[in-house]
Amino acid sequence: MKLLVLWVFAMMATVAMSRRWTFVRYHYINKAYEVTMKIQIISGFDRQLTAWLRVHGRRLTNNQKKTLFFVNRRYMQTHWQNYMLWVKRKIKALGRPAAVGDYTRLGAEIGRRVDMVFFYNFLSGRKMIPPYSAYMAKLNALRPADVPVKNHGK
C-alpha cells in the first residue's frame, strides 16, 4: 500500500512538472552526456538526503535510510524525460554544439534545484517509507552512471 501511494505521488508530480497530459517524446542523447547527467543529478539528490539525515535521521532505521536513497534514484528515473525537455531547451539556448561540461552543469543544477527534502519530510512524517526490498537493494548497488533510464544513450 505504501509503495502504491508513493507511485501515485510520483506520477502526480510527473504530470505537474510536465504541465501536460500527453505523451512526452523521448529525447536520446550521447551516452557520455547521459552518464554525466545521471551522476550529477543523483549526487545532488544524495547531498540533500545526507544533509536531511543529519538533522532528521536519528528516528529512522538503517533500512528506511537505504529506502530513501532508493527514492532518489527512482525519482531520477521517473522524471528523466521531463529533465530531458528542460535540458534540450537549455542546450538549444547555448547556440553552439553541447559539450560534456554543459551536461555536467545542467545535471548539477537539476540535482540542486529539485527540492527532495519535501519528499523526505512527506514520506517520513506520514510513516510512508516502504520496507526495504531486494529490488531496491539492486538499484542502490548500481553506480549512478549505471542506473537505467527509459531512453538510454547510444
Curated annotation (Swiss-Prot):
Subcellular locations according to the entry: Cytoplasmic vesicle, Secretory vesicle, Acrosome lumen
Keywords tagged on the record: Cytoplasmic vesicle, Fertilization, Signal
GO biological process: single fertilization
Superkingdom per UniProt: Eukaryota
Signal peptide interval: 1-18
CC per GO annotation: acrosomal lumen
Tissue expression notes: Sperm.
Predominant place of localization: cytoplasm
Subunit annotation: Monomer. Homodimer. Molecules associate into dimers and then rapidly dissociate again. Interacts (as a monomer) with the egg vitelline layer protein VERL (via VERL repeats); each VERL chain can bind multiple copies of lysin.
Function (record text): Creates a 3 um hole in the egg vitelline layer through which the sperm passes. Does not have enzyme activity. Species-specific interaction between the sperm protein lysin and the egg protein VERL exposes a basic surface on lysin that may dissociate the egg vitelline layer via electrostatic repulsion. Plays a role in ensuring species-specific fertilization.
Protein name in the entry: Egg-lysin
Species in which this protein is naturally found: Haliotis fulgens (Green abalone)
